């Protein structure tokens, strides 16, 4: 079976080849090449776009236990100084998906050599960071023949020490939505503002107004966030901007709050149209459903891991993080948990450096849990 050093070597291989959503061609090829070493009597594989379904056969299966591992990297120039740094310029595994895949391979390896009664399905999912791979992957015909009875996933957590996992029954991660607002006015010479409709000014006004949406429309005991990450507009210092664009994100802890926030944003955009004599178009290119953990399965998992001393178990609060694993939990019961990796730098940071000892912790937790669920 794969030992700690071999698992770390796999993680470092994957770390060097981060790829964006639905472009994970090298990553998929690496996984297939690794898994091809196992006997076809023990595993079956089905590709799905740039993702992969892998079934580890049980000895006398009546159920299917599933585990999802996301695959894609981010458009972030790496600044870790690793000797195994990304070879893809401007791209990095800055959210731990290299560890997620490595952990899945470790669990697969264990059960290839020591099978349990039930079948295990591993879903290597592309495009978690965008545009979203979970929802379309669920439409695959593969899931008609390998239908999970429950599904699990994990995500690295830089803020927790190695040897700690954190989760909670119920809502774990927020509903999230991308937000794009296009403003179209009338450009002109900087010396003649009265003959133009300045979209930089309109965009500035709208950003300020958006700050009132949460504070005056969302229950103070609820939580929601609107963040405008980029504003673009204009072409030169002496030209009044005809166009401006706001790109951001909305995050809420309930679908109802998401609907309310969107309505208020659209109302403010209409006000900008009137006040600045322009055209405002509001779009939501993609959105992720909340991660809502099964109460029964999560409580059982937390109790088992704590009682067996497999990891330190923390019941955490919900987070405003977005995760398309929520779509999988809409279809199948299951849960997600945080895996402590003790990094000084956080997720999506160019210097994220997770402690690789966490890989072994996660493999041990998941193999023990699947054995327990199979009654072994």
From Swiss-Prot:
It is an enzyme of class 3 (hydrolase). Its EC number is 3.5.1.47. PANTHER family: N-ACETYLDIAMINOPIMELATE DEACETYLASE, PEPTIDASE M20 FAMILY MEMBER. It comes from Bacillus pumilus (strain SAFR-032). This is N-acetyldiaminopimelate deacetylase. Belongs to the peptidase M20A family. N-acetyldiaminopimelate deacetylase subfamily. It catalyses: N-acetyl-(2S,6S)-2,6-diaminopimelate + H2O = (2S,6S)-2,6-diaminopimelate + acetate. InterPro entries: AcetylDAP_deacetylase (IPR023905), Amidohydrolase (IPR017439), Bact_exopeptidase_dim_dom (IPR036264), Peptidase_M20 (IPR002933), Peptidase_M20_dimer (IPR011650). GO terms for biological process: diaminopimelate biosynthetic process; lysine biosynthetic process via diaminopimelate. GO terms for molecular function: N-acetyldiaminopimelate deacetylase activity. Keywords: Amino-acid biosynthesis, Diaminopimelate biosynthesis, Hydrolase, Lysine biosynthesis. HAMAP family: DapEL (MF_01692). The keyword Cell membrane does not apply. Coiled coil: none annotated. Pathway: Amino-acid biosynthesis; L-lysine biosynthesis via DAP pathway; LL-2,6-diaminopimelate from (S)-tetrahydrodipicolinate (acetylase route): step 3/3. NCBIfam families: amidohydrolases. The active site is at residues 70, 129. The keyword Amino-acid biosynthesis applies. Catalyzes the conversion of N-acetyl-diaminopimelate to diaminopimelate and acetate. It holds the Pfam family Peptidase_M20.
């Amino acid at each position: 079976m794969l030992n700690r050093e071999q698992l770390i070597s796999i993680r470092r291989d994957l770390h060097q080849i981060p790829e964006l959503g639905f472009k994970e061609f090298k990553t998929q090829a690496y996984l297939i090449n690794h898994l091809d070493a196992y006997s076809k009597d023990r595993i079956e594989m089905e590709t799905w776009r740039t993702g992969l379904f892998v079934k580890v056969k049980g000895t006398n299966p009546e159920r299917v236990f599933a585990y999802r591992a996301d695959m894609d990297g981010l458009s972030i120039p790496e600044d870790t100084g690793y000797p195994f740094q990304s070879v893809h310029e401007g791209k990095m595994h800055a959210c731990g998906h290299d560890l997620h895949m490595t952990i899945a391979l470790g669990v697969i390896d264990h059960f290839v050599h020591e099978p349990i009664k039930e079948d295990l399905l591993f879903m290597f999912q592309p495009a978690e960071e965008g545009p979203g791979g979970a929802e379309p992957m669920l439409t695959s015909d593969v899931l008609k023949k390998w239908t999970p009875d429950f599904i699990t996933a994990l995500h690295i957590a830089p803020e927790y020490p190695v040897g700690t996992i954190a989760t909670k029954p119920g809502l774990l991660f927020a509903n999230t939505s991308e937000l794009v607002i296009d403003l179209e006015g009338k450009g002109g010479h900087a010396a003649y503002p009265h003959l133009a409709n300045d979209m930089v000014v309109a965009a500035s006004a709208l950003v300020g107004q958006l700050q009132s949406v949460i504070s005056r429309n969302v229950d103070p005991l609820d939580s929601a966030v609107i963040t405008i990450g980029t504003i673009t507009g204009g072409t030169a210092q002496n030209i009044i901007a005809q166009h401006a664009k706001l790109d951001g994100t909305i995050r809420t802890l309930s679908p109802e709050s998401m609907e309310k926030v969107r309505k208020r944003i659209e109302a403010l955009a209409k006000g900008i149209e009137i006040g600045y004599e322009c055209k405002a178009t509001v779009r939501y290119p993609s959105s992720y459903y909340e991660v809502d953990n099964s109460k029964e399965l999560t409580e059982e998992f937390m109790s088992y891991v704590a009682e067996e001393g497999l990891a330190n178990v923390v019941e955490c609060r919900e987070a405003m993080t977005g995760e398309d694993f929520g779509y999988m939990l809409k279809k199948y019961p299951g849960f997600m948990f945080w895996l402590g990796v003790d990094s000084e730098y956080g997720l999506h940071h160019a210097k994220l450096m997770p402690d690789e000892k966490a890989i072994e912790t996660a493999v041990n937790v998941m193999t023990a849990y699947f054995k327990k669920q199979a009654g072994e």
